[in-house]
């Protein structure tokens, strides 16, 4: 069994999370990031696109999101600053992005309602799973993709450009371009 109290030199749990290393998810810095995102997502959940604070709140959750991209509330993420969204992308309501690992969504994408993006991977070994640890693996969605309602994208998956994923699909492996 792994010793989770033996921290590597000069590496925070947050840095481990971002670099696909096993990290402790109840670390104070990680939890502060989650709490911040949760507060902002809760605030966004009662807004409409016409709300005066809508754009400011979306940009606080996902820094750098283009003006041309839209998120329909409610929306939930773990951190927000692990998400990159391209130009003219539409993310429908009830989207969940667990972004301990980076989530990149290309330009001109359509993300259906209730889509879920999960970057965390819990340990396979049951004894390790009893500890508050996991790894996170990036998800990448290419340009011009369409994910139907209720799609689940699992840790480490890349969906190639111009692909269409049918509603209700669970994507566990990479999808080539034009699929």
Question: Residues of each region from the PLM?
Answer:
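C-terminal/domain-terminus segments
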Residues: 159-174
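Flexible, glycine/small-residue-enriched loop-and-beta-strand segment within the central core
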Residues: 52, 75-85, 90-159
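Short secondary-structure boundary/capping segments
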Residues: 14-15, 61, 131, 138, ...
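Short glycine-rich loop/turn motifs that provide flexible caps or phosphate-binding loops at active sites
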Residues: 19, 147, 155, 165-167
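Conserved beta-strand-loop-alpha-helix hinge in the C-terminal portion
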Residues: 177-179
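Terminal amphipathic alpha-helical/low-complexity segments used for targeting or macromolecular assembly
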Residues: 1-68
């Amino acid at each position: 069994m792994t010793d989770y109290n033996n921290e590597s030199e000069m590496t925070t749990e947050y840095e481990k999370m971002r670099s696909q290393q096993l990290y402790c998810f109840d670390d104070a810095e990680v939890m502060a990031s989650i709490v911040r995102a949760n507060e902002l997502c809760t605030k966004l959940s009662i807004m409409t696109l016409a709300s005066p604070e809508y754009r400011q709140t979306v940009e606080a959750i996902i820094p750098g999101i283009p003006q041309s991209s839209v998120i329909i509330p409610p929306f939930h993420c773990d951190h927000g600053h692990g998400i990159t969204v391209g130009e003219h992308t539409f993310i429908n309501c009830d989207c969940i992005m667990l972004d301990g690992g980076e989530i990149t969504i290309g330009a001109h994408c359509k993300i259906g309602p209730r889509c879920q993006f999960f970057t965390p991977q819990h340990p396979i070994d049951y004894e390790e799973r009893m500890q508050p640890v996991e790894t996170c693996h990036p998800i990448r969605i290419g340009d011009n993709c369409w994910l139907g309602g209720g799609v689940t994208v699992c840790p480490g998956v890349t969906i190639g450009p111009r692909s269409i994923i049918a509603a209700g699909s669970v994507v566990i492996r990479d999808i080539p371009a034009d699929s």
